[in-house]
Structures are given as C-alpha cells and as structure tokens.
Design a protein with these regions (language model features):
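Conserved non-cysteine loop/helix-boundary elements of the Radical SAM core domain that shape
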Residues: 1-86, 90-109
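Auxiliary Fe-S-binding modules of radical SAM enzymes
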Residues: 101-227
C-alpha cells in the first residue's frame, strides 16, 4: 500500500467477489473475509479511494448469502462498488466445473432480481454502484459459454427498480382509476417504460388499468403520480 501511495496511485479496487468464506473456498480464493477487512483498513489508513467488486451467483452462493455480502460491504464503506454477475467463460476454472456438471449458472431473471435488491441496499447506504455487468467485449463474447449475460444488464435492473416505484405509488391509492399519469424526468422515461414497454404492460395487468401515461418533465428529480 505504501508503494502505491508513494507512486501517486489514488484509487484501489479489490475484487473480493463475496464475503462468504464457503463461496470463496469453492472458487479457490486463498483469502477469506478477515483478510479483506485488513486490506480495507490499510487502504483507508492511507486515504486512498476504495472500490470493491462483487460477483453474485458463484458456486455455493444464493440470495441470502449474497445479500449478506452486500451488508458486509456496506459495513466497509467503500467509495464505490462494481457488480459483475457470474458468467461461465471458456478455459476458466468455473468452465471446468460447469463442464463436469458441478456448477449451474443462474438464469437472467433470477440474477436481475438479486442485483436489484443489492442496488437498492447500496442506494440506501449512499454507496454508488458505478458498474453492473461486463462490457460487451468481443473477446469475452466469443468465449462466453453460459450465464446471465445481457448487453444492457444495468438498464434492466434500473428499469425493474423504476417499475417497483410505480407499483408502490399505485398501491397507496384508495381507489385506482382506469387511467393513470406519472410525471417523470425526461432522462428516465425509458426506465419507467421498460424494455418494449414491459413495465407499462406489467402494471396494467397487475392493477387492471386501461392506460398509463408518462408525462415528461425536466425540472423534477424523481417520479410523481399526478392522476
């Protein structure tokens, strides 16, 4: 750490993947969460910017285990977080486990729901998630074998969160009219619409609403139900 500081390094990222020792052991990580805590303490002592990376869906991981990892990471108070859903890439240890039938990748829907829950927790803790999902690198795509990959993974997660916000507002109404209008910031319209208007279609089906209109506004920070 001293060497990094002396050479003007300002940001350090740790790919901790998980805080669960069983998960870390299953993927051959040599250090456990205690070691991670020690490293974070050393980084903080030298006033370096700290980023932590998580990988949901590793062997022996599940929803409760990963959300505990999220809670543990929040306790470490990093400056930012990246979340990389686990994918099976050719010529890796995980690929060998997959080939032997020892690892089953998560579905896209399952991963989206888990990452959504994690994003909500990080937002509550005021910790920015600066990246979700891998870049669409040609080399990676050539070697991608299986797993919950989507080129717009972050958009899908943010769109699910947006849908939940609309649903929550509608649920608070005493009487739900056949038509509703939401005011949304112009830069978030696509999030509230959902992919191919999936959010609007889903909400209409849930509540038996005939029409949902989105009214663009540039002077609002968040969603507002107006009718």
């Amino acid at each position: 750490i001293s060497f990094l500081k002396d050479n003007f390094v300002q940001v350090v990222e740790l790919g901790i993947q998980s805080t669960n020792n069983d998960v870390l052991s299953a993927v051959g990580r040599p250090c456990g969460f205690t070691t991670v805590r020690g490293a974070v303490k050393s980084i903080r002592k030298r006033n370096l910017t700290l980023g932590l990376q998580l990988m949901p869906g590793l062997p022996k991981d599940d929803e409760s285990t990963f959300l505990q990892s999220v809670k543990d990471v929040i306790g470490l108070r990093p400056d930012f977080v990246r979340i990389y859903p686990t994918l099976v890439i050719r010529n890796t240890t995980l690929f060998k486990m997959y080939s032997r039938g020892e690892y089953l990748p998560w579905s896209l829907d399952r991963m989206l729901q888990l990452v959504k829950a994690a994003m909500i927790e990080f937002e509550k803790a005021d910790i920015p998630v600066i990246r979700v999902g891998l870049h669409s690198d040609p080399s990676m795509l050539e070697n991608l074998v299986d797993g919950p990959y989507h080129p717009s993974f972050r958009y899908l997660v943010d769109s699910l969160i947006a849908r939940d916000k609309m649903v929550s507002m509608i649920e608070r109404l005493k009487n739900i009219p056949p038509e509703l209008t939401f005011k949304v910031p112009s830069n978030k319209v696509s999030l509230y619409l959902g992919h191919k208007k999936s959010n609007i279609d889903k909400i209409k089906k849930i509540f038996g609403i005939n029409n949902i209109f989105l009214q663009q506004t540039s002077n609002q920070e968040d969603l507002k139900l107006v009718a």
